[in-house]
């Protein structure tokens, strides 16, 4: 009978990524998150986990997390250091800018924790550019891969990969850099790829709802949009952008055409995984976040709205009965979903620890 591994979660947010860890045999004992509203939600979802709220750069916070982890013999660490400094949606798109962005140095506190705690298994995840990140170490620009190899190469096997959540059971295209460290003498292989799950398979059985309407299902209601936005999207076919419409085209109040990218005001497709869900999934003008819709008898399309919270949950791989309080602000839920690594990806990666050892 396998023995459960005790775990630590750094930069946990509300803990979406770790949601299924208990199913594979990893029990998160302690977590750390800076932003209070995310940490408070984490504590409500995981009432038995110890949440340390505060900045990990604060030595008192760092030591508190470390001491709890040591006391509980933590042997697994998962860390998702903030990615805004590396995100392609951000401004820092070249190595030199990233090296001067203080947010990108938060990974050094993960490294410091590993050196103190020495867990058997470590999973660090972030946007794909993480693997190209270079930081100033002793006044020298050094790739993150070299930093980790120099610090831990003698004790750990270190693996660098870019994985797409859609290849591991999540109905969403979401590529993440995955760094795995496992102590020498242990094995940690990648999981086998799985069958692709489409948007239709994930949310196709949910009732159709229009903007401002409620289905009666928890978290499945149509977010409110302007009459003009609804009109544009009603005339936009599945998989298309309103910017491709000949008549019902996004316009300003004075009638002038809005300038924008074809990824905006765009319906997603039914027959493939959803595009990457972004933090602005509440805005119908944002990237590829409008319901696919279905053709109606009058020639328009249904569901002229952004995806509902329930649809976002399913497309992230979360269950309908995800334990979030009823009074959780919708925008907070949308933000943490837009930032998270899908939990089925983490589950599949970590299950290999137990399959091999």
Swiss-Prot record:
UniProt name for this protein: Type II methyltransferase M1.HgaI
GO biological process: DNA restriction-modification system; methylation
Transmembrane segments: none
GO molecular function: DNA (cytosine-5-)-methyltransferase activity; DNA binding
Taxon lineage: Bacteria, Pseudomonadati, Pseudomonadota, Gammaproteobacteria, Pasteurellales
Family, as annotated: Belongs to the class I-like SAM-binding methyltransferase superfamily. C5-methyltransferase family.
General remark: The HgaI modification system consists of two cytosine methylase genes responsible for modification of different strands in the target DNA.
Domain called SAM-dependent MTase C5-type: residue spans: 5-357
Organism expressing this protein natively: Avibacterium volantium (Pasteurella volantium)
CDD domains assigned to the protein according to its UniProt record, in alphabetical order: Cyt_C5_DNA_methylase
The enzyme's E.C. designation: 2.1.1.37
Gene this chain is encoded by: hgaIAM
Reaction(s) this enzyme catalyzes, per UniProt: a 2'-deoxycytidine in DNA + S-adenosyl-L-methionine = a 5-methyl-2'-deoxycytidine in DNA + S-adenosyl-L-homocysteine + H(+)
Keywords linked to the UniProt accession: DNA-binding, Methyltransferase, Restriction system, S-adenosyl-L-methionine, Transferase
Top-level EC class as recorded in UniProt: transferase
InterPro entries xrefs: C5-Methyltransferase, C5_DNA_meth_AS, C5_MeTfrase, SAM-dependent_MTases_sf
Active-site residues (renumbered): 83
NCBIfam families in the record: dcm (TIGR00675)
